[in-house]
Amino acid sequence: DNLFSPNFLDYVNQNLEIYKNDDSIFAINGYSFPLGLEMPQNALYKTFMYSPWGAGFWVRKYKAVSEIRFGDYFYSKKIMWQLFNKVPFLFDTVVSMEYSHVYYSDADYRVRMLLNNMYCITPAITKVRNCGYDGSGINCGNDDGKHASQIIDNNVFCGEMEEVEVSVGAIIAKYNELFEVSFIRKIKNIAKYVICLVRNS
């Protein structure tokens, strides 16, 4: 379902080398969510939103983040309350995971990165187009072409790219807008979380 830019591997390899000694960088994202950020086309920015739709990792950093256990944060009421207030769409997904006994690695790792002040390097223009949100598969519904119609970088080489600073607050606001959670759903999520806590007691 994923279409890759001709320069995807060039982009990933370049940035794996550039950021290898920066322990705050968890991965190099190829995919960039349609946030509507205003920045140059050759720009990079940091985000906690790891995307499994094409990414590059360092084994050392991946192992370090993987050592954090899901239960370490899920059963912390303080952490989950912060998540509910600041990033409700992540609270929604994480609660659904535990309540329904399913696992979404991308959501799990996004929370781990937020808790550890870690980020993924992400291109302004996506290097990956996901065509799987057309309602034809079993995992994703139809998003009215939002992902399948994304402009993709079709250059053969990625060239020199420049990191642009975007505040975590601004990034979170954009994602909350993209993945808006209704008030009723938020109430249902709190109820599900309480049920999960009772189950574990």
Positions of the model-derived regions?
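Peripheral/terminal regions associated with large enzymatic or DNA-binding modules
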Residues: N2-S201
